[in-house]
Amino acid sequence: MFSTAASPYDDLVIKATDENLASEDWALNMDVCDKVSSDGQNGARQAVTALQKRLSHRNPNVQIYALELANSLAQNCGKDLLGELSSRNWTSALDRLINDRATSTPVKKKALSFVKSWAKQIEETGDPNLGLMGELYDQLRAKNHVFDEPEPTPESAEEVRRRQEEEELQRVLELSKQDKGGRSLFTYQPSGSAGASSSSAANNNTSPSIPQSQAQPLAQDQAQSQAAPQVTGYAPQPQKIYSPQPLEPEPPRVDLNTATRVRAIYPFTGQEVGELDFERGDVIKVLDRGFKEWWRGACNGKIGIFPVTYVEALPEPTPKELQEKAQEEARVFASLGLVDQLLQTLKGIDPARGDKLDDHPEIEEMYQASVALQGQINTLIKKYSDQKAELEHMNANFIRAMGQYEELRNGPPLVQAQPFGYVPPQPQPLLQQQNSYSYQQYPQQPQQQPQPYAQAPYAQQAQPQLQPEQYAQQTPSPAAQSQASYTAQQQPYPAQVQQDPAAASPPPNQPFYHHGGSTTSVNRIPSAQTAVQPQPHGAPSFPPSSPPTRQVTEPGVAGLGAGDQQAWDQYYQQHGQQAPHSSQHPSQPQSQPQSQPQSQPQSQQGSYYPAHAQAQGYQAAYATVPDGRAYASPPLPGTQQGQGVEGVTAGMDRMSVHAP
């Protein structure tokens, strides 16, 4: 019940010092530094407490990662954290870690180096309250602990080559100062012997010619005989012939655009998904050069893109380097037996029986040898992680290429053939919108659809009866409807029946039906032979229409079909009208002529003929129903013409009678 609450830094520190990490995770270390900087002194205290717990861990990796994290905090989090590092708890934990015999040598070296650097850093602050770290440093130095400096970073191949070139240049300059251009081959002579030498030269010139092969030994003998008595105590030293040592073959310069391996010269942390993170000195295997500034590579078991400006080219490994790496790898795998032996020995020790590690010095030796293998094991883990990532990338590319190959080889999939004349159904979202637009703009006028003019006036053209669905598809546009409505309003008939808009306009979800009159020069009278189209609710009913039929009637009638008397009676009964019995309908306009043409027999004016009456009824029906065209008004009963020969000749007779 006295246990303290879990610190928010425990999880962060455990994650940053995980024993399974192959190397320090600097990204996690920076996250911890940022959090400590934002939390101030309280955050520094909690972070150092969490690090102190990790120092007591028995895994050397955890201890090394904890020391590295503490050093990162000391370099980035200011005076608050330096004060916590100078606390009694932290310095005591470091003292126990360094003086413990079970602590591995790499951990001791790193702890001693950090104690020295932290003591110097705290001393520079000048705060007298932070003297515990300096005291610890003095105590450890009094115990003859060696505070090794941090190991220098290994020189790169470029730096080694440059250093060798500078050394070779200095050596050549020293040799050039000692070299006199071959003058040491001649024997030194004092200035007093100049005359003798000149006289001897004259004697040589006046002497007879001697072969050159004999003259050279003679000249040498004369020079030696003259120089020997003149110079006393001088022994010419033999000339040192400079023989340059064979230099190591300079590694060939590798073009960055052709190199298969590159080394990072700057650390890089990716900001986007798919970017490769690496530290300075990491070797990256180049996999793809798809872009000019960004390449794809493998490093630390991951594959991603990296900036080209952050790396430098590496030459291919020489056979000697490959052999050394193979031998080192074989040594690591051969040491696995040592690790297994250490594990079995540790299992045989039981503290309950009183066994102690101090009684088994061989365990300490095996443990230290196993810890020394840790760095090599991590290197091999990175190597095989990169190879695994490369193989996975290769496998993915192979699967993609195999799929494309099969697709190209088998061809595109066959499209199922549709029957002839098949048209896929298409939705008509504007149908209801057009209908509602028509009814809302002109609610009092029934919508009509103009019929095209017939091309052959004397030929019977069958008008197909369309189904309601087809009528719905042939709904006129709003522009045509508005024009037809405007024309209907201009009709001069005073006896137009004003209908109720609610009764005249059909429901918005039902199609509109309209049977227009004939637009040809020959008027047609409907007949009952064709079935009457069903009228929607609320729409006015119209006379039944059918193609005209020729029947034998009384003389003087132009063969018009008499139609169905029962259908006409039903129509008049529905509208509350009476069948016409006179030649003039009451609803007929006064402007129409009252007399029949003279070409008609007088007996027809006073008598009632079925065809004549039906024509008058048809005219009355047209007077009650507004039509969208001025020419659609029916002709007078006396001037109705049929489609027969008699009707045509009768019209021609009237024209001849009334011609001016």
UniProtKB/Swiss-Prot annotation:
One of its GO terms (cellular component) is endosome membrane. It is found in: Endosome membrane. It comes from the Eukaryota. GO terms for biological process: protein transport to vacuole involved in ubiquitin-dependent protein catabolic process via the multivesicular body sorting pathway. It is a peripheral membrane protein. Residues 517-533 have a biased composition (Polar residues). Keywords: Endosome, Membrane, Protein transport, SH3 domain, Transport. Pfam families: SH3_1, VHS. One of its GO terms (molecular function) is ubiquitin binding. Residues 16-148 form the VHS domain. Residues 158-182 have a biased composition (Basic and acidic residues). SMART domains: SH3, VHS. CDD domains: GAT_Hse1 (cd21386), VHS_HSE1 (cd16978). Belongs to the STAM family. This is Class E vacuolar protein-sorting machinery protein HSE1. It comes from Cryptococcus neoformans var. neoformans serotype D (strain JEC21 / ATCC MYA-565) (Filobasidiella neoformans). The lineage of its organism: Eukaryota, Fungi, Dikarya, Basidiomycota, Agaricomycotina. The gene is HSE1.
